[in-house]
Amino acid sequence: MIRSIEQSDHDQILDLNQNALDAVGSLDNEDLSLLVKKADQAIVVDTDGDVAGFVITLPQDADYDSSRFRWFADRYDEFVYLDRVIVSPDHRREGVGSKLYDELPEDVPVALEVYEHNDTSLKFHRSLGFRRVGELEHNGTVNVMMLRPAS
């Protein structure tokens, strides 16, 4: 079942996030609450009460202090920023990621960044129609900036 993130999901989401720091930035409960408040989309795939995965997107006019978000805002007039998407290791290869990406808008470009060393994610996003549109070095890590054009 796909549904909105609820307060009761926060512990599971934070656990998933903190166990994926090789691919996403760190979050604490306060950060997550603020992010969900600013989001235009904050959803989970719920499998019998277990958060199998989640996605959080932000509108282009969000008040969001992120160099990666600003990189897109400085270059594109219209986009949705995919801040993070994580699938639980217990639910990989079950179509959870595909379900989350199916929920992304198709009529607006979707922008995201992937760490340069994350070959699996880069390959996955290219297969979904995302293309490389630049790079940004942030805290010593090279972020590959990717965009999926509107359909």
Set out the residue ranges of the language-model regions.
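Conserved GNAT acetyl-CoA-binding A-motif
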Residues: 101, 106-118
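Conserved active-site alpha-helix within GNAT-family acetyltransferase domains
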Residues: 98, 116-135
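Conserved acyl-donor/pantetheine-binding loop and adjacent beta-alpha core of acyl/acetyltransferases
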Residues: 56-84, 92
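C-terminal "cap" of GNAT-fold acetyltransferases
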Residues: 135-151
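Active-site rim helix/loop that mediates acceptor-substrate recognition in acyltransferases
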Residues: 22-48, 62
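Glycine-rich acetyl-CoA-binding "A-motif" of GNAT/NAT acetyltransferases
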Residues: 50-53, 120
